[in-house]
């Protein structure tokens, strides 16, 4: 959708309800399947062969993509880098918003900056967007708040549609961001190396995601409880992942750090032997 609306609107205050859940975090975790469904609804062509984002100009030639984000949004951007390079065949990088402002960022024709922010009010990301625009770079945003500061700052945007997220530890917003970035990679890939058949297969898998996520959450309920008990006494925890799972590993480390206030780390699997293994101990998880 195009965020640059000419009229002012008064935001509606919504009071979130717990329903059957004991915490908002639990509620939002189990809303992920529906949120992915809402984020993707109406954004495919009638024959499901291509992605359609109404507010994105698909006529521009994109030669490079730069993702901007902080915290969880930065981790979504890390996944976006893999998607853009492996699916769309477009060189990509990801920058921590607070660092981007103070770097000498080379620009070239065909560069697209994608700002990721659930609230649309992340000040470091807003300033990073302005920095990119000052250099003449095209900018879009992936945000959950249409009339937010970032949404109004960028030229174009993609609205997440996940509803209010109350918990400090982002869950459903993250899965929505990752899904929309994957769809963006498929969209840009069709202008590059991705065939119609390949695009259709990716879209088929994306449409299956809500069921897959819902089924996985139901299946893992008991095993998650057992894992939580087993790890509750550990003083520290390390998450490992390779390729697409590396951003998930550091996102998992951030989640445990935010929620349990223990020391956590995330590394590429192959890096374990290059230093991190030194602080492993029997109480380590």
Residue ranges and their predicted role:
Residues 60-208, 242, 281-282:
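Glycine-rich phosphate-binding loops that contact phosphosugars or nucleotide phosphates
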Residues 31-36, 40-66, 156-285:
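Active-site phosphate/pyrophosphate-binding segments
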């Amino acid at each position: 959708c195009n965020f640059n609306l000419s009229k002012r609107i008064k935001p509606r205050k919504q009071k979130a309800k717990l329903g059957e859940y004991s915490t908002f975090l639990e509620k939002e975790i189990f809303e992920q399947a529906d949120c992915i469904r809402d984020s993707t609804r109406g954004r495919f062509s009638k024959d499901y062969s291509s992605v359609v984002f109404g507010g994105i100009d698909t006529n521009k030639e994109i030669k490079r993509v730069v993702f901007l984000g902080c915290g969880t949004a930065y981790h979504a951007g890390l996944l976006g880098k893999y998607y853009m390079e492996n699916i769309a065949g477009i060189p990509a990088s990801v920058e921590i918003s607070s660092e981007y402002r103070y770097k000498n960022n080379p620009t070239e024709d065909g560069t697209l900056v994608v700002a990721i922010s659930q609230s649309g009010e992340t000040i470091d990301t807003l300033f990073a967007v302005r920095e990119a625009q000052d250099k003449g770079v095209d900018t879009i945003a992936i945000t959950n708040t249409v009339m937010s500061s970032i949404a109004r700052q960028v030229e174009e945007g993609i609205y997440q549609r996940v509803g209010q997220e109350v918990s400090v530890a982002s869950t459903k917003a993250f899965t929505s961001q990752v899904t929309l970035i994957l769809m963006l990679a498929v969209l840009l890939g069709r202008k590059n190396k991705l065939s119609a058949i390949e695009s259709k297969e990716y879209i088929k898998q994306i449409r299956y995601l809500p069921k897959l996520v819902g089924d996985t959450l139901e299946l893992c309920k008991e095993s998650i409880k057992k894992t939580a008990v087993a790890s509750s006494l550990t003083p520290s925890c390390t998450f490992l992942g390779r390729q697409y799972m590396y951003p998930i590993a550091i996102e998992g480390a951030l989640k445990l750090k935010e929620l349990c206030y223990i020391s956590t780390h995330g590394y590429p699997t192959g890096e374990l032997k290059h230093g991190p293994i030194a602080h492993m101990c029997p109480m380590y998880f």
